[in-house]
Amino acid sequence: DKKIEVKSERDVWQKTGNIAIEYECYGKPSGINATESDYWFHNLCIGDETFATIVFDTTSLKRIINNLDKKRSVSGGDNNAARMYLLNLQKLFSSDVIKAFKETKDAA
């Protein structure tokens, strides 16, 4: 059986073009750094409705994040205790990110 992790991004993504991927909370690994899921589902919501869902193989998403030339880290959540990577959606699917992804697979 395959496991999935489901995250929802509400409204702000429309203005910023970014999604947030949590990696730490209260100084401990969380989100992408703690998940045991095989797949990461990221819902893009408008209000209470799901506009679209992006599905990543979790290992691939980690590889993409690790190979990004620029990634912004921000605090958020309750008490600003969570640390998250802000990933720009256009950048995420750009040719240079896809090329780097292919190159890291070839190098493995």
Segments (PLM) and residue ranges:
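Conserved catalytic cores of phosphodiester-cleaving nucleases, focusing on short active-site segments
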Residues: D1-Q14
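Short acidic, glycine-rich loop/turn motifs
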Residues: D1, L44-I46
